Amino acid sequence: MKLTGEVALITGGASGLGRALVDRFVAEGARVAVLDKSAERLRELEVAHGGNAVGVVGDVRSLQDQKRAAERCLAAFGKIDTLIPNAGIWDYSTALADLPEDKIDAAFDDIFHVNVKGYIHAVKACLPALVSSRGSVVFTISNAGFYPNGGGPLYTATKHAVVGLVRQMAFELAPHVRVNGVAPGGMNTDLRGPSSLGLSEQSISSVPLADMLKSVLPIGRMPALEEYTGAYVFFATRGDSLPATGALLNYDGGMGVRGFLTAAGGADLPEKLNINREGQE
């Protein structure tokens, strides 16, 4: 186990990628505190992991709630080694032309308050503990932090902002705290949208992402949630990732290396090399 004795705090950790991260970190020997708005899902998480996980019901937009989560983690486990600001909302690729003029301000605030301010609050709340433990921060970014069409202008702007946060925080917190970012691609989660656009009850799981990404990604399929968690484990380890701070990992199935005519240039390699891979796909 790679994280034996370590303690992590994860925001938005009761569902989706966050829950997969909790499961993986506990499996690697860590103890985990989770800040999430769903009391029911937090109870399920605590039952599943016993004394290795504690939940705090709260709003990532509130610095006081973030401080309560940090205090609960310290009370339960004595330290914070890794912080993963992960909670977010999506704009469902609402284009600028489709944003009603009377809702732009509210939608901007909704998305930026969760996706950017929530991350800043998390670091602020945990900073003394992270400096004390010489720990690390691993921000969840998105492919939208690097490429267009991963969302609309509001979501894309928030994720580009997180890229800037990684770099600035890596500078400000050095040499005491390492700060890195993981930019996953599409995944099947319960990610919701802003209430200002009437999207708070819509889930990204209703979008047929797996079918859409199959022909788009060079790896040929949409990764499962648990397949995204390894990068976070890597950045959280103290030995293997010691030189890494300010690092941005595109972990999206190869979006940046797609070809113009086809996503994967080597799709016919087994045929060319007379390799029989029947039953291995």
UniProtKB/Swiss-Prot annotation:
GO terms for molecular function: cis-2,3-dihydrobiphenyl-2,3-diol dehydrogenase activity. Its EC number is 1.3.1.56. It catalyses: (2R,3S)-3-phenylcyclohexa-3,5-diene-1,2-diol + NAD(+) = biphenyl-2,3-diol + NADH + H(+). Disulfide bonds: none annotated. GO terms for biological process: catabolic process. This is Cis-2,3-dihydrobiphenyl-2,3-diol dehydrogenase. Transmembrane segments: none annotated. The keyword NAD applies. The active site is at 155 (proton acceptor). Keywords: Aromatic hydrocarbons catabolism, NAD, Oxidoreductase.
